[in-house]
Amino acid sequence: MKLPGIVTPLIAFVAYAIAQATPNYTSPLDVDIYNPSQLFNVSGPWSLMSRAGNTLYISGIRGFYPSNTTLAPVGRERVLQAFLNMKMLAELGGSDLTSCLRLQVYVTDMYRWRPLVNQVQEELWKDVAPSYPPRTILEVQRLNDDDIVEVEGTFYLGD
């Protein structure tokens, strides 16, 4: 699998961020809300992930580079970056791809982007799991900033 050249420096950046991971807020019912600004800056009134019990919920993530928040080039690289961003958040929250319970993918053109989503998912999961998590892929009219793909995931954290 060939990954963009930004991945190596990004791994060091993420390792630092993981060490710093603490919830931004914990609700009275023990739901932890995370908004790790050292990785991503959110663009509205939402958070990147939450943890309730042994389940981690990651909000819709797009294909931008965390180091400078610019979008990856349109096409395969952007789809890959969206999945890598979700993967980084899962790892930050204490999980990984092998513990993905469910994926939801939004694309603006099923015909153009679904094959790339399938290709990227096959590449990322081929060495980590014997099968793939349940996934729903939906075509939507428009995404934030006229993007082409957004990925969200639910992950198991163990007992």
List each language-model region with its residue ranges.
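N-terminal presequence-like segments and the immediate start of the first folded domain
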Residues: L3-L84, M88-G93, T98-L101, V107-D159
